[in-house]
Every structure is written in C-alpha cells, then in structure tokens.
C-alpha cells in the first residue's frame, strides 16, 4: 500500500489557456491530488516558467509533452532541477508510422515524464514503437481523462445554453465542430501541416483549401435553406497561433453574419454545445465520440478518407454533398430520428470505436491515471536544485512590465506586439477558478454516487484498480 503524503507536497500545473481541452484534462487529476492526497495545487500560464524557481514545487503536471514547445521546455527544466514530471496526453490518436507526428515538439524523442499515459490499447501498441526499450515500462493505458467530464459533469439545461447564445426561439439546433482550416492562412502553415501529405506539401495544402470551401458551402446552403434552425459553429481551440491574433479564413467565419448562426470560440464549453444540439457535425473531429456519449446523431461533412483521420466516420452518417446534408436535416426535422438512416450494425460499432479511441467511457479515466501517478509520490526528491534561468526571468519581466502598457486595440495594430496579446489575455487564466469549482463539485458527487470515495479516503488504490478493471 502506498502511504498518503504526510508532509504537504506542492504541485504546479501549467496550461496554455484557462478554459478548454488541456484544462479539462488536468482538473480531474488535480482534484484527486488536492482532496485525497493532501497536495497543494496551483495552476499557471505557460509563460510563467519563473514560478518554478519561485515556488519550488515537488511535482509538475502537464496536459502533454509534445503539443507545445513550452510544455517540453517546462518538462526538461523541471526534470533537470530534480522535480517530478507527470503528464497526460491531449491527443491519443496518432499516425503509427510517423515518429515526428508522435513526438511533436519533443525533438529529443525521449520520454521526460514518469509515466507515458495512453488513451487505448491501440495507442499503447503504437507508443511502444516510438520508445526505447528502457522506457517502454513507463507506458500505461489510462483512457482519456478529458472525456470523463461527459459522464461526471451534470448536463446544462438547453434553455440556459440557448439563453447564452441569445437564441431561445429556435426549436432545432445543429452544431458543427471546426477543423482549424484557419491555419492555412497563418504564417506557420507549413509547420502546421508538415505531417500532411509530406511527399507533396503544396498539393496537400491545395486539397485542404478545396475541402474548406466545400464544407463552407455545405454549411452555407443549409443555413440559408433552414432559417428556422440555429447553427452553432464552434471554432477549433487550437486553430490560432500565438503570433497571429487576427483570425484567418476558416470554414465558418464567413457565415457568422447570418441571423441563425452563432460563431462560438471559448465562450461556451464544448459539452454544453453538444448537449444543446439535435445533430452534431464536423469535417474531422474527435468530438463525434463525445457526441455519442450524449447519444447525439452525428454527420461527417467529408467523404474523402485519403488523409490522416480517426475511424469515427465508420459510426456516423456521411454527407458527401449539399443535397445529402439537406436531406439529413429534413429527416431529423420530420422524424426526430435521423439515425434510422444508419444500419444497426454501424450503431453497434460505436462502443468499439469509442474504446479503440479513448479507452473507457465510465468517467473514471482520471482514476486510472491517478493509480499510476500516486505510485510515484514516494519517489519525490527531498532536495531540488532549481537554478535561475535567464530566459524565464526575461519572460517574467516582459509580462510584468508590459501589463502597464498593454492595450489590445493598439497592440493588434503593431506586428511586433501581436504575439503578446495572447499572453496578456491569458496570463491570469480568467475563468479557471470558476470552472475548477464546478468540476470539483461534480467529481465529488460522482465519486460518492459510484461508491469510489471509500477507496480514495482509505488510500486503497489496489482495491480501486480491481473495481475499475471489472467495469
């Protein structure tokens, strides 16, 4: 049995945004650390690297160590300083034949963290291909913690969400999850799409632009043909780069002027948008899995499978053109049962597809991850050697001094200052504490409802693990 932490340890979690995917991945983990392991937790913005020196944490927690260069820098610096690094994974579906795609910004292509958490058995097998033999023992299957909220969070009322959208008079809602086509109009587009069509980059980019226009036109035709239907278009959370606050063209923002369209960025959570929708759609998005967890019918606006994609299209309706999309909307209007169009065997595949992608759908993936993380607590070093890093100091001074001069309207006009808009808008992590309180409250109720709090209170992790594996 692993003993609970007797002297209060400190955990520092870094995120690049106060709300959204990465934050949702970490909050269930920090809840268990705080409530059951008596660990002090703080969240910081990723530019606040100097806080590692100032606070001297025992544990660094990250949503991933490949999706952002600063996540990798934080992990490397912390490990060299004698601080334990724990990390999850923001994306569990990757190309099994492309090491560069797997490692991302982790150019050394070596695991830095204590455990390499995988969403599924399939991801586990793929990950082993990219890790040296000595690191393969770190690779474990936990499921995707960010998907747990679709099970443990209470569903927001549709009327409340429609009120937020200022659209209470609509009886039918169609949601669309954006694909980050806006990166095509970004100065870093070649870096963004380097793993797409590597044999002919320009041809691939031209193909993507063609797909953007096709999806835009499908949405536009549906919006114009169904003025009584509300279309909620959700921008991809990772579409924008830090140095380009001016949005590039995507498949949605040319449609935002229609009265029956709401173009949403981060104002409303993705689970609330899925919940309010009668149909959930996308070009290529793992949110289709999330829609299935809410028993929502799903449509893919893309019939071309000749590019890297997950297998969720095998469990969704596919609209190949404008006419098919229109017919599906009409079918839902008339019958309220769009998925009559799907064969029963396809609907039956969804459970398998979900498990293949995100591992488990019981809301307990965060506990599977914590089963491994808590094993490492006894290995926390009593002594640390956190040196003063001049780059971290410069970033801190830029933020501290710059905040006195920051004016968004001015900075957006100055190319050299545009990157800093992202920093000043996000450094304080606005809204995080409110979201944290909601998630923590929901998790506490969920653990009690499932009878899991007894294991956690009594530190019976092996018994808990046995229960989780039976489900």
Predicted regions and their residues:
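Active-site and donor-binding regions of nucleotide-sugar-utilizing enzymes
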Residues: 10-158, 176-179, 239-240, 288
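Short acidic active-site motifs
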Residues: 48-51, 268-269, 324
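Acidic, amphipathic alpha-helical patches
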Residues: 106, 219, 269-270, 325
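Short, conserved active-site loop motifs that form the nucleotide-linked donor/cofactor pocket
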Residues: 114, 139, 259-262, 316-317
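Conserved catalytic-core segment of nucleotide-activated headgroup transferases in glycan assembly
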Residues: 152-251
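Donor nucleotide-activated moiety binding/catalytic core segment of transferases
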Residues: 211, 238-289, 293-294
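Catalytic binding pocket for nucleotide-activated donors in carbohydrate/polymer assembly enzymes
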Residues: 248-256, 286-361, 422
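C-terminal amphipathic helix plus adjacent low-complexity
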Residues: 330-471
